Amino acid sequence: MNLIPMVVQQDGRGERAYDIYSRLLKDRIIFLGTPIDDEVANLIIAQLLFLESEDPDKEIFFYLNTPGGHISSGMAIYDTMRYIKPPVATVCVGQAASMGALLLAAGEQGKRSALPHSRILIHQPLGGFQGQATDIDIQAREILRLKDELSLILADLTNQPLDRIKTDTERDYYMTSQQAKEYGIIDEIIVKRS
């Protein structure tokens, strides 16, 4: 069941009903509250590109509450965040796990934040393979390549040594907001909006 609240806004021309995500987009807010797959990534990318076309100099706010998801889908969002001109401020509400943690860290330096009770998780890419032995070998080499690529990106975003990233992502590595700040994934913890 997919419930999307509607909000009613009044202006000089009368009342207008918006789904909540469209209303947030008017304020340059993108909300990711699902696992990341190709469909979700395409929606996020379209919103980023739209907001850039609306005003290439005005900040975009990207709120995340996601368990992560597909690497290729997440990397498409990551690349778009880096590609567009407006700065993207990231905010974790709830959790930013796996690819979600990388997207959280990919926000504009100084504008990456989390609410106090957020949970951040980094780990190595997950993969399950089946098929012929040669195909499994190809898939295993690709997952190792992705592991190295994601480790390099995370090391760059957090200013952590690559060896530490590789060690910490060998297994699930959970962090509180405070630990994520110390790690370099976020820059601040937001208790109350100022």
UniProtKB/Swiss-Prot annotation:
Cellular compartment(s): Cytoplasm
Active-site residues per Swiss-Prot or TrEMBL entry: S98, H123
Molecular-function GO term, any one: ATPase binding
Keyword Cell division listed: no
SUPFAM superfamilies: ClpP/crotonase
EC number of the protein: 3.4.21.92
GO cellular component terms listed in the entry, alphabetical order: cytoplasm; endopeptidase Clp complex
Highest taxon of source: Bacteria
Keyword Chloroplast part of the UniProt annotation: no
GO BP of this protein: protein quality control for misfolded or incompletely synthesized proteins
Enzyme class label: hydrolase
Key words of the record: Cytoplasm, Hydrolase, Protease, Serine protease
Coiled coil regions, renumbered to chain: none
InterPro entries: ClpP, ClpP/crotonase-like_dom_sf, ClpP/TepA, ClpP_His_AS, ClpP_Ser_AS
Reactions mediated catalytically: Hydrolysis of proteins to small peptides in the presence of ATP and magnesium. alpha-casein is the usual test substrate. In the absence of ATP, only oligopeptides shorter than five residues are hydrolyzed (such as succinyl-Leu-Tyr-|-NHMec, and Leu-Tyr-Leu-|-Tyr-Trp, in which cleavage of the -Tyr-|-Leu- and -Tyr-|-Trp bonds also occurs)
Family: Belongs to the peptidase S14 family.
Function: Cleaves peptides in various proteins in a process that requires ATP hydrolysis. Has a chymotrypsin-like activity. Plays a major role in the degradation of misfolded proteins.
Assembly, per entry: Fourteen ClpP subunits assemble into 2 heptameric rings which stack back to back to give a disk-like structure with a central cavity, resembling the structure of eukaryotic proteasomes.
Protein name as catalogued: ATP-dependent Clp protease proteolytic subunit
